[in-house]
Amino acid sequence: MNKKTIIYSIKSALPVMTGYSVLSIGFGLLLQDKGYGWGWAVLMSTGIYAGSMQFVTLNLLSTGASIITTAIMTLMVNIRHLFYGITMLEEYSEAGWRKPYLIFSLTDETYSLICSPDLPDDINRKDYFFIVSLVNQLSWIAGSIIGSVLGNIIPFDTTGIDFAMTALFVIILLEQLEKSKQHLPAITGFIISIFCLLLFGPNQFLIPSMILITIALFIEKKSLERSDF
């Protein structure tokens, strides 16, 4: 793991690290607002590390949800990670000792950083994956602790903080559209998502849309490799 790879990886991850720090501070504030201390912030951000699911978990904890309800909700919220993993099978197959952690730490934003870049020849690709994944999680853990501590010291109005995660998704999408010449995946995802939203409703559209998007992109894989659209 050379110095150049470390520096390059951190620079690449810096936008997500910044966003994660802000979002996780919000999570820490909400956690404290629900009556859970910084120890819970460390535990959840280390052991769960799934931004949107951590926000959902707060509601599940505060309402005393059953294990079955929690399991079903977790599956529904994080089912998209299954599709991320499918696309990374080849990349992660030779990751060696890094592989278990890479699988665990594959979040939406980390996926957006590791699935698209054309890395310089002198940058170790597997080390890049690992460092980006690690620093992203460390920034999330640090922000969670800071938010929890601040929430204990200073009173905050936490209304609307959970929308920050959605805002980050939108920003990442716009950055990807700006950098990439291939806009067909985003257009395909948008059209299919709207279709499934209208067909299945806001509470049921996520899984069908992810399945249809994955099928559509596999079908269009060859044309995507040739196209600049």
Tell me the role of every PLM-derived stretch.
Residues 1-8:
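Short, Lys/Arg-rich, polar N-terminal cytosolic tail immediately upstream
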Residues 8-103, 117, 139, 185:
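Pore-lining transmembrane helices
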Residues 25-29, 58, 86, 148, ...:
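Transmembrane alpha-helix boundary and packing residues in multipass membrane permease domains
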Residues 49-52, 76-83, 168-174, 193-195, ...:
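Alpha-helical transmembrane segments and their membrane-interface exit regions
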Residues 72-162:
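Helix-loop-helix junctions within the multi-pass membrane cores of secondary transporters/permeases
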Residues 82-91, 115-119, 171-178, 216-228:
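C-terminal ends of transmembrane helices
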Residues 124-208, 215:
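Membrane-embedded alpha-helical modules
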